[in-house]
């Protein structure tokens, strides 16, 4: 991946807004992913999910970790080792969910940035989200 392009763009991302929307959309578009978040409360409708304070807070937490990972593009497996262990060994998250979240994140970035999120930038982010998803699923291999 083009580190300079990725980090330069990422500095413009409002992690709290994008994270909240990405996680919310994941839960709405792929409702089976809600099983890990049932304790958050009412997730019975798209509006309930998108307005849920716990979903928003966890979405920010997810993207804060993603931001940290961008500082280690040469060692994503190392950067996400402890989160891989948590999500795989303790929470038993389906590794496919990491790929789905990456796909949703790309959609949200395109929505927020429009023409600025051009095909070249999208291609770079597709590589990054695939790398992060692979790193998070590493404990399954």
From Swiss-Prot:
Q: Does the keyword Oxidoreductase apply?
A: no
Gene Ontology annotations of biological process type? hydrogen peroxide catabolic process
What UniProt keywords apply to this chain's record, in alphabetical order? Heme, Iron, Metal-binding, Oxygen transport, Transport
The entry marks the following residues as binding heme b, namely 58, 87
Q: Which body tissues produce this protein?
A: Red blood cells.
Tell me which Pfam families the record gives.
Globin
Spell out the subunit comment.
Answer: Heterotetramer of two alpha chains and two beta chains.
What the record says about family reads: Belongs to the globin family.
More about this protein: This type of beta C chain is found in non-anemic barbary sheep, whereas the other type of beta C chain is found in anemic barbary sheep.
Q: What does this protein do?
A: Involved in oxygen transport from the lung to the various peripheral tissues.
Q: What is this protein called?
A: Hemoglobin subunit beta-C(NA)
């Amino acid at each position: 991946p083009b580190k300079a392009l990725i980090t330069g763009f990422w500095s413009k991302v409002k992690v709290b807004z994008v994270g909240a929307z990405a996680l919310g959309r994941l839960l709405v578009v792929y409702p089976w992913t809600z099983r890990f978040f049932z304790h958050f409360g009412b997730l019975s409708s798209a509006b309930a999910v998108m307005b849920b304070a716990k979903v928003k807070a966890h979405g920010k937490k997810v993207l804060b970790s993603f931001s940290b990972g961008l500082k280690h593009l040469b060692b994503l497996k190392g950067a996400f080792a402890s989160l891989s262990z948590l999500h795989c060994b303790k929470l038993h998250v389906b590794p496919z969910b990491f790929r789905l979240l990456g796909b949703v994140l790309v959609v949200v970035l395109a929505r927020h940035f429009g023409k600025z999120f051009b095909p070249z930038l999208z291609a770079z982010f597709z590589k990054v989200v695939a790398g992060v998803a692979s790193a998070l699923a590493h404990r399954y291999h």
